[in-house]
């Protein structure tokens, strides 16, 4: 389950602003980690950028008329700030750990190959944000144990996702840290429960 916006409820101007943050994240991942990193791009971290930007109001840089290789016929607007770089690093950490976990579960060779391609980028992001990297690593290990033991306490299992996301949402150790951790925790629990619900629908249909 990705955290995305309901575009039907947004004005055209707000759609463009949201897209500019998404494009800004994409290009930041390219500049910080290379083209291969762009394949790991997701909307979850765009949501985090919008959330933290609205809260902290950092100075942003806007670039109009940008044309990317994915959409060569459309001119885009890029919007970036210091939070964009943080979100790019979180995107890399999450992608790498998920790829490794999927490889262990499914023995998917393409995922293993992509994880190996991201290894250098992962090490760079991990060095910059060791606390967040440890939170994701611990989360996957604890979730794996719960799955192996067939833990049926969905609230407790969903709480693992919440704890991890809470750490990622708490960008700084400041007056917003507690609120952001709590928000991320509830968001993470909701995401896990919705994923479980979608899986139930898939297997029962």
Where are the language model's segments positioned?
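Low-complexity, Ser/Thr/Pro/Gly-enriched N-terminal "stalk/linker" regions
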Residues: 2-23
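Hydrophobic alpha-helical segments and helix pairs
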Residues: 84-146
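Short active-site segment of divalent metal-dependent hydrolases/proteases
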Residues: 198
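Alpha-helical phosphate/pyrophosphate-handling elements in metalloenzyme active cores
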Residues: 16-101, 149-186
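Conserved small/polar residues in nucleotide/adenosyl-binding loops
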Residues: 203-204
């Amino acid at each position: 389950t990705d955290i995305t916006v309901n575009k039907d409820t947004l004005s055209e101007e707000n759609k463009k602003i949201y897209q500019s943050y998404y494009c800004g994240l994409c290009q930041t991942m390219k500049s910080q980690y290379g083209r291969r990193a762009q394949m790991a791009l997701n909307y979850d971290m765009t949501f985090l950028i919008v959330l933290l930007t609205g809260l902290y109001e950092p100075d942003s840089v806007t670039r109009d008329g940008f044309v990317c290789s994915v959409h060569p016929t459309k001119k885009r607007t890029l919007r970036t700030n210091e939070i964009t770089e943080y979100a790019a690093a979180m995107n890399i950490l999450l992608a790498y750990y998920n790829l490794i976990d999927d490889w262990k579960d499914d023995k998917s060779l393409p995922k293993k190959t992509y994880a190996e391609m991201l290894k250098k980028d992962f090490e760079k992001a991990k060095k910059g944000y060791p606390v967040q990297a440890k939170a994701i690593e611990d989360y996957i290990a604890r979730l794996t144990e719960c799955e192996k033991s067939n833990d049926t306490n969905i609230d407790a299992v969903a709480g693992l996702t919440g704890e991890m996301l809470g750490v990622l949402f708490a960008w700084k150790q400041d007056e917003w840290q507690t609120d952001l951790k709590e928000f991320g925790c509830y968001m993470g629990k909701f995401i896990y429960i919705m994923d479980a619900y979608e899986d139930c629908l898939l297997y029962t249909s």
